[in-house]
A protein has these predicted regions:
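Conserved ABC ATPase "signature" region
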Residues: 70, 118-136
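Conserved ABC ATPase signature
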Residues: 141-145, 149
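A short, proline-enriched helix->beta-strand linker immediately N-terminal to the Walker B motif
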Residues: 160-164
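Catalytic Walker B motif of ABC-type/P-loop ATPase nucleotide-binding domains
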Residues: 166-169
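The feature captures the beta-strand-to-loop junction immediately N-terminal to the Walker
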Residues: 39-41
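Helix-to-loop junction immediately C-terminal to a conserved catalytic motif
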Residues: 54
Length: 263
């Protein structure tokens, strides 16, 4: 893995809110084509880290390189070109309630790619199909969609500009187990088909056991450990041991083992 290209390289990241220090000297890499899961206890700063990487928050200290470029050092137009290579799915979906599903997905194509409304809406249909939404959902408003359909619509919008990196913040939160498993498999399929690099924040142990290549654990204001699941779960840390070897962790591991035997 270490011989592969780093698409994100974070070094010495510090994030503070007044006197509260969330991250201190945090280092993290995302390699091309991998699915990296970021986990940690409440208050460990997972979403703050995501926002720092995608440019919604500037760290108090540290360097973030994306595709080898220091985002903080780029001019606005250069930075915009880099950020167009991001696709972001926020935890709540963040769809515009006054727009239909198709219009939500078409909007970035109109605003950032300069497509006509007709062309943007045609391409939006392609993205909706990629995300596994039925044609019948295209003209609906977010308020009439189920939680799973909202996630898929938001994913279609995240894919609108053909990103290289997909950022997912708790993508299976609020989904039932069947819906969550289907969404996990969709992410895996899209990664393989489109060559995406995926930065995934999750609490879902089933996700960790079924689709991730590496896991980074945020603890003590830094990345305590990052590596394959088999390596991470053996780390001598109280939170890690409880998380991976408690009742829920054991159940997720057993489910993943059964699924592997059935393939």
């Amino acid at each position: 893995m270490n011989d592969r290209e780093k698409v994100i390289e974070a070094r010495g990241i510090c994030n503070r809110f007044g006197r509260q220090v969330v991250h201190e000297n945090l280092d993290l890499d995302l390699y091309r084509g991998e699915i990296l899961a970021v986990v940690g206890g409440s208050g460990s700063g997972k979403s703050v880290l995501l926002r720092s990487i995608i440019g919604l928050r500037r760290p108090n200290e540290g360097l973030i390189k994306v595709f080898g470029q220091d985002l903080a050092g780029l001019r606005e137009e250069q930075r915009s070109l880099v950020e167009r290579r991001f696709g972001v799915l926020f935890q709540k979906g963040a769809l515009f309630s006054s727009l239909t599903v198709t219009e939500n997905v078409a909007l970035p194509l109109i605003e950032h790619a300069g497509l006509s409304r007709a062309d943007a809406e045609h391409l939006a249909g392609v993205k909706l199909a990629l995300a596994g939404l039925p044609i019948s959902a295209a003209d609906k408003y977010p308020s009439s969609l189920s939680g799973g359909m909202i996630k898929r619509a938001a994913l279609a919008r995240a894919l609108a500009l053909d990103p290289d990196i997909l950022f997912l913040d708790e993508p299976t939160a609020g989904l039932d187990p069947i819906g969550a498993a289907a969404f996990d498999q969709l992410i895996l399929t899209l990664r393989d088909a489109l060559g995406l690099s995926v930065f995934l924040i999750t609490h879902d142990l089933d996700t960790l056991y079924t689709i991730t290549d590496r896991i980074a654990v945020l603890s003590q204001k830094k990345v305590l450990v990052a590596g394959p699941l088999a390596e991470v779960e053996q780390t001598n840390d109280a939170w890690i041991q409880e998380y991976f070897h408690g009742p829920r962790g054991r159940a997720a591991e057993q489910a993943a083992t059964r699924a592997g035997q059935e393939r």
